[in-house]
């Protein structure tokens, strides 16, 4: 299983973010994107996720479902938590499972894995920033996708939350999944670094 990009060019708002960018990540590997703010780390994640279209180049995934678009085999966890404040923890997770086309699953297993079982019926509006982040992470668990695209994934997580997420990432990699992450903080797992843009 291998995810790759060749000759990628990204233009946003009339400004060229990067050009001629190549990358590659294999199953079981975590690729950490590093670079100054504005270098294009988030833009690359959004290109892979299908949220932006490249001005040039291509992205390919040699996985178990070659006819399925890359975007449909990837989870994108942005730096903002996409939650409905009026819905409970379990209702938010059910929404994302259904939205992403997942099979009926035990939502409580995902909720327990991120340490929110005590708050399962609590509206998201009442969650702390760290709890909201944990709930967002639970989305990765209820629908199985081999590619995790993570943008500052440990933001708002305390030390225990970071350790919890490191375990989940390790489990994902051990099962053959791959991770591409943009982060300024250590992820707590072994990564291969890729610099985007000129050194600061």
Swiss-Prot record:
One GO location term (cellular component): plasma membrane
UniProt keyword Cell membrane, yes or no: yes
GO molecular function list: ABC-type heme transporter activity; ATP binding; ATP hydrolysis activity
InterPro entries for the chain: AAA+_ATPase, ABC_transporter-like_ATP-bd, ABC_transporter-like_CS, ABC_transptr_haem_export_CcmA, P-loop_NTPase
Catalysed conversion reaction: heme b(in) + ATP + H2O = heme b(out) + ADP + phosphate + H(+)
Limits of the ABC transporter domain: 1-200
Major localization class: membrane
Top EC group: translocase
Entries under Gene3D superfamilies matching the protein: P-loop containing nucleotide triphosphate hydrolases
Signal peptide boundaries: none
Subcellular location: Cell inner membrane
Keywords from the UniProt entry: ATP-binding, Cell inner membrane, Cell membrane, Cytochrome c-type biogenesis, Membrane, Nucleotide-binding, Translocase, Transport
This enzyme's EC code(s): 7.6.2.5
Binding site for ATP: 35-42
SUPFAM superfamilies with a match to the protein in the record: P-loop containing nucleoside triphosphate hydrolases (SSF52540)
One GO BP: cytochrome complex assembly
Membrane topology per record: Peripheral membrane protein
Subunit composition and interactions: The complex is composed of two ATP-binding proteins (CcmA) and two transmembrane proteins (CcmB).
Protein's job: Part of the ABC transporter complex CcmAB involved in the biogenesis of c-type cytochromes; once thought to export heme, this seems not to be the case, but its exact role is uncertain. Responsible for energy coupling to the transport system.
Similarity remark: Belongs to the ABC transporter superfamily. CcmA exporter (TC 3.A.1.107) family.
Protein name per Swiss-Prot or TrEMBL: Cytochrome c biogenesis ATP-binding export protein CcmA
Organism encoding this protein: Rhodopseudomonas palustris (strain HaA2)
Encoding gene per record: ccmA
